[in-house]
């Protein structure tokens, strides 16, 4: 058995397979249009986008792939192969939202927010595929962006990057009930291959920092813990509220910690906060500093420094922000002891999903084998579920022809 799972790429072979499945389930004979929407991870910038902080982001070679055709009316239909392996189907029109949260909520909400943004007359018949759903890679942002891109295409609506980010945010905030910021959407919308994006979440803009020459000798690896996540059932919203409470104690006019004036962010004032709120503020302000240092390290090709900042970030997420799950904390601790791992941190909110590692390219196979041996030794029930994959860089969400 290999230590690194088969790598995924949006190759023509993968697309052809999904197109064939889409035609079979819909009964259509014509070729569909296709949206490829990659997933993302953030090596630095955890839990601070909703606090006005900048974020370092990178798209990764896991995907939402949406095959679609214009429908015959304003109604849309959607088919999905869910985790249990069974096909599910639904049909809906604009504003047809169900009271209960369902697998198709994000598609229904995407139709609704786009109709609020611009005049729409055309629905789609679509089939959606996801390579790693609910693994802390922002598959939700990825699939929402895919829906919006397809719906805009069939209605001849031009969406700029900022439009995609804002409409996707509305789906997450207004319909999924998450109080998250926009780093997930921005990470994908502004994604660029062979680079890291420095995201300014307040300005909704990005600066791309090209991979340094030193990355020729390094790789990003990702390890799926075997335990999926769902932010709507996590402590995500509570943490956002705690950060807001800390901000208002530091500066009454602040809605989040990023709005607290710099002169009021000193050690003494933060230390005077209630312990829990002080730790939340320490994480946010420390992570803001690490993002700046990380951007400089990436530009300078200082891989060791960048990796150490990832370690510090993950440590703060665990101890100051208190977001790590049992399995991800175990992976983090194991990875820190493996030679050739420059740094690691878990992805997403840390409530389940994946760990990302920056590693020595020549030691990739050995690192993967050692990590899995130790991890499965602790959690034998996850054998055959947990896996290590190469995390190659990807670009932005895009429309392609089959």
Regions found by a protein language model. Give the residues of each.
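C-terminal nucleotide
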Residues: 1-40, 44, 69-102, 195-343, ...
């Amino acid at each position: 058995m290999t230590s690194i799972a088969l790598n995924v790429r949006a190759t023509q072979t993968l697309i052809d397979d999904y197109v064939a499945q889409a035609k079979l389930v819909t009964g259509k004979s014509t070729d569909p249009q296709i949206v490829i929407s990659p997933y993302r991870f953030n090596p630095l910038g955890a839990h601070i986008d909703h606090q006005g902080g900048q974020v370092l982001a990178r798209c990764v070679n896991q995907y939402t792939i949406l095959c679609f055709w214009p429908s015959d009316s304003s109604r849309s239909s959607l088919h999905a192969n869910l985790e249990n392996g069974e096909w599910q189907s639904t049909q809906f029109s604009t504003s047809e939202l169900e009271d209960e949260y369902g697998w198709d909520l994000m598609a229904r909400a995407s139709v609704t927010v786009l109709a609020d943004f611009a005049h729409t007359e055309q629905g789609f018949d679509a089939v959606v595929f996801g390579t790693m759903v609910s693994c802390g890679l922002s598959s939700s942002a990825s699939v929402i962006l895919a829906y919006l891109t397809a719906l805009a295409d069939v209605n001849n609506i031009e969406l700029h990057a900022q439009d995609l980010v804002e409409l996707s945010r509305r789906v997450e905030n207004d319909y999924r009930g998450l109080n998250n910021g926009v780093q997930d959407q921005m990470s994908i919308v502004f994604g660029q291959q062979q680079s890291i994006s420095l995201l300014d979440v307040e300005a909704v803009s990005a600066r791309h920092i090209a991979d340094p020459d030193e990355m020729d000798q390094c790789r990003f690896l990702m390890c799926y813990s075997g335990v999926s996540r769902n932010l709507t059932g996590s402590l995500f919203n509570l943490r956002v509220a705690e950060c807001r409470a800390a901000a208002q104690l530091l500066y009454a006019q602040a809605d989040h910690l990023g709005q607290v004036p710099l002169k009021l962010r000193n050690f003494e004032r933060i230390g005077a906060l209630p312990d829990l709120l002080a730790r939340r503020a320490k994480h946010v302000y420390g992570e803001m500093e690490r993002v700046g240092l990380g951007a400089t390290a990436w530009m300078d090709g200082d891989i060791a420094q960048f990796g150490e900042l990832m370690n510090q970030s993950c440590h703060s997420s665990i101890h100051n922000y208190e977001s790590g799950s049992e399995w991800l904390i175990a992976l983090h601790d194991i990875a820190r002891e493996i030679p050739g791992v420059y740094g690691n941190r878990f992805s997403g909110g840390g409530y389940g999903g994946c760990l990302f590692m920056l590693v020595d390219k020549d030691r990739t196979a050995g690192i993967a084998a050692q990590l899995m041996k130790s991890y499965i030794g602790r959690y034998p029930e996850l054998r055959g579920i947990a896996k290590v994959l190469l995390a190659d860089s990807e670009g932005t969400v895009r429309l392609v022809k089959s």
